Amino acid sequence: MILQEQELKWSLEKGKSNMTIKGITFIGGGSFGTALGIMLAKKGYNINIWDRKPHVIADINEKKENIKYLPNVVIPSNVKAYKGMKEALVGIKYVVISVPSHAIREICRNMKDYLKEDAIIISVAKGIEEHSGKRLSQIIKEELPKNPVVILSGPSHAEEVAQDIPTTVVVTSEDVKASLEVQNLFSTNKFRVYTNDDIIGVEIGGAVKNIIALAAGISDGIGYGDNTKAALMTRGINEIIRIGEKLGGQRETFWGLTGMGDMIVTCTSMHSRNRRAGLLIGKGLSMEEAIEEVGMVVEGIKACKAFYELKEKLKVSMPITDALYRVLFQGEDAKYCVYELMTRDKKDE
């Protein structure tokens, strides 16, 4: 009872201080964007959610629930969904992009005419651009050069954030002031936010871990055990480190929340769509069938293709990524790929 009273007092105090902010807009009404919007609405902010899908907009506004992406979670009254991007963005200082990574560039181009010049762009997407290999912050900065860009990443499944289960994430930016603003904006007594100055490491860790989670799911689907998953995760973090350092990231970042932490939760959680897709593929479904069954974007599939191209170009050893690419895009048998991984040349750890 005392804890509930403290939380209510804390929420009311935060709500008073938040009256000066006109609102926060989320571009994309998926599960994670909705969960973060609910969390910030509880702090007293007015939340706008823009989405293309009429049924998502209707459900949020009329039923106060995102039935498609975050069912059985009540959405507060100070959350409103919009079909028009201009209406959702005008006068807003904080804009959270929560769309699939492949849509980032198009979304930024569509937003450009409606943004305040000092609006801070916060991306919670994870991935890199196919063919160019550019990180999402680079894409956003190319399209919106006047606006500060902040990346929010870490082990944070939407289903748990929406239920106020204690969660810890990281924000990073080339603009230190913007990073600190976003840290303050998102921090609650159930959602702890650290800052980190290694934007490259944070973004690469968050993108590559989805590849490892897909592989871990396939292992589970085949019927392999904890030994196999432990090996995949441990060797997987080494792949993250190798490609991450090659791209300019710092090794210590990959052992933190946005590397090891995010990989652990994505490889093991029942909420992980990447692990779930891998599980289905391991049980015999095709990649297309697995995506349809999951019903949401599986970032690890696009990441696998993009990082396969990038590691070939940079000549970085990523054997798990290699094996997954052959399973997904060349039709090789997953068990045979595991056999190949296990019988590679002997070497020191």
UniProtKB/Swiss-Prot annotation:
EC number(s) from the headed UniProt entry: 1.1.1.94
Subcellular location: Cytoplasm
Keyword annotations from UniProtKB, A to Z: Cytoplasm, Lipid biosynthesis, Lipid metabolism, NAD, NADP, Nucleotide-binding, Oxidoreductase, Phospholipid biosynthesis, Phospholipid metabolism
UniProt entry tagged with the keyword Lipid biosynthesis: yes
Record has Secreted as a keyword: no
Residues bound to NADPH: 31-32, 52-53, 126, 158, 273, 297, 299
Gene3D superfamilies: N-(1-d-carboxylethyl)-l-norvaline Dehydrogenase, domain 2, NAD(P)-binding Rossmann-like Domain
Annotated positions binding sn-glycerol 3-phosphate: 126, 154, 156, 209, 262, 272-274
Any one of the GO BP annotations: carbohydrate metabolic process
Any GO molecular function: NAD binding
SUPFAM superfamilies assigned to the protein according to its UniProt record, in alphabetical order: 6-phosphogluconate dehydrogenase C-terminal domain-like, NAD(P)-binding Rossmann-fold domains
Main location, first listed in the record: cytoplasm
Pathway: Membrane lipid metabolism; glycerophospholipid metabolism
Domain of life: Bacteria
Catalytic activity: sn-glycerol 3-phosphate + NAD(+) = dihydroxyacetone phosphate + NADH + H(+); sn-glycerol 3-phosphate + NADP(+) = dihydroxyacetone phosphate + NADPH + H(+)
Residue numbers annotated as active site: 209 (proton acceptor)
Protein family: Belongs to the NAD-dependent glycerol-3-phosphate dehydrogenase family.
Stored NCBIfam families: PRK00094.1-2, PRK00094.1-3, PRK00094.1-4
Cited PANTHER family: GLYCEROL-3-PHOSPHATE DEHYDROGENASE (PTHR11728), GLYCEROL-3-PHOSPHATE DEHYDROGENASE [NAD(+)] 2, CHLOROPLASTIC (PTHR11728:SF1)
Protein name (record): Glycerol-3-phosphate dehydrogenase [NAD(P)+]
Species whose genome carries this gene: Clostridium tetani (strain Massachusetts / E88)
Organism lineage string: Bacteria, Bacillati, Bacillota, Clostridia, Eubacteriales
Gene assigned in the entry: gpsA
